[in-house]
């Protein structure tokens, strides 16, 4: 039986080019028969009235007809309009790159409207292509193994009942493990982070920088793609057993170290609401399990992880959080040595430190499968965004 944590419906063998005419004229009619009602519901829920997708001089309008059914017709009849390259259109349909990746890349594709219209369209397109229903207000509940309401404030320890922990994680999309690392082990990891930060250079593609108020030189705030043991302690040995309870053959992939200072005025340090699969490859890689080792305390004063409970279970915008979404928002406070766990599809954010810096080391565990080659363009987009300077929101 497939694991509840394995949502993959594509593999590298499914990668192909999608032509705008062939997709709309040949594939869309078949998809309409299967998922047309879901896609219409998704478009209604998105708030998007209409959008034109164009590649060169070929244009198709997506909207709802008078009966409320999804309508796709050739020509420009919509309010928003996205002029895409052949590669971008193909990657969007095939889920190799997403509309959020278009946003982050800075590609000027919106002839009319704004990039949020394309992001809204993508949820509708995923309903049509993949049969993934959009979120309906009030449609999710959270229950424990006994069917009772789930206590979203609950925390666990590694020795707790695996079935209870996996039920919590599968329902909520996040989990807090207390006391995973000792004070001495946290000190070891912090010393290694000190070395990483001192030795970082802007020329290193794996580092991100930000400008701090009152400082002339940008400061390294993130080092990506570190191997197991890079912080002096094996994450596989400490966390691999817990991740194994997912029963989806997850394996350690990499560590990203985040060093979040106070008073960032430029650069990416604290991200707004997003999913880790926001840039693409959801249907090839999710659910990844992301374990965040708290190297400092976290909370309202020095920043913390915020999650939208249950967001990994539904099709909603990959970026930002609509006021219409009624799912619980949970902000997690930690002590050094605690570990937050979230899935790659869980909508989450990071609040900025106010009084003291925050450090966290995120270990990503991925399922077996040769998808590394598909990540190249996504990593280029991600790392370029981290190296460029953006005013924080």
What is each of the regions a protein language model found here?
Residues 109-110, 176, 341, 362:
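Hydrophobic beta-strand signal
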Residues 267-333, 371-380:
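Catalytic core of non-heme Fe(II) oxygenases with the double-stranded beta-helix
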Residues 85-96, 239, 268-279:
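Short acidic (Asp/Glu) patches
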Residues 334-347:
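Conserved metal-binding segment of the jelly-roll/cupin
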Residues 346-393:
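Non-heme Fe(II)/2-oxoglutarate
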